[in-house]
A protein has these predicted regions:
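Double-stranded beta-helix
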Residues: 2-13, 71, 124-150
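Short, solvent-exposed loop/turn positions at domain surfaces
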Residues: 79-81, 87, 103, 111
């Protein structure tokens, strides 16, 4: 049975057909390259915004032009408005919900939904009535993100 591998870079692609899957390797060694997992539900992943109005999300991964933060705000609205002048912010609600007040309007996110806040737009997060556990992934990325599906 042939295996197909599609390689993509800078808008180009190359399709390879192999006799064996690319996961069938004799050995893979590196001190720098590895798969990493992070359980964002772990209590040890504790951003300062969990129970503090002035708290902020916890940065967990970073590369040039992108940063991934975990937010678990549950008791108090942000005590300040934030205007990110460097990045667009893509907010993914993994668990619970969050109200986002922005100068472009107010959006309520529920688990499974995402919100793109463009660079330079003032915003703040407000937990919904009743609080509860909220887990959000915030992706800070180079500005001018555009939606490509539907």
């Amino acid at each position: 049975m042939p295996y197909t591998e599609k390689i993509t870079w800078q808008g180009r692609s190359l399709t390879l057909t192999r006799d064996e899957p690319p996961t069938k390797v004799v050995e893979a060694r590196s001190d720098e390259v590895r798969l990493e997992t992070l359980d964002i539900t772990d209590a040890a992943v504790r951003p300062s915004n969990l129970d503090a109005a002035e708290g902020t999300p916890l940065p967990v991964f970073q590369a040039p032009g992108v940063r991934v933060d975990v937010s678990k705000r549950k008791t108090a609205p942000m005590g300040f408005w934030h205007r990110n002048m460097e990045h667009d912010e893509l907010i993914f609600c993994n668990k619970g919900g969050m109200i986002w007040e922005t100068e472009l309007g107010t959006v309520t996110l529920r688990a499974g939904q995402m919100l793109l806040i463009p660079q330079g737009v003032a915003h703040r997060a407000v937990p919904p009535e009743g609080g509860g556990e909220n887990i959000l992934i915030e992706l800070k990325m180079a500005p001018m993100a555009r939606r490509v599906f539907p």
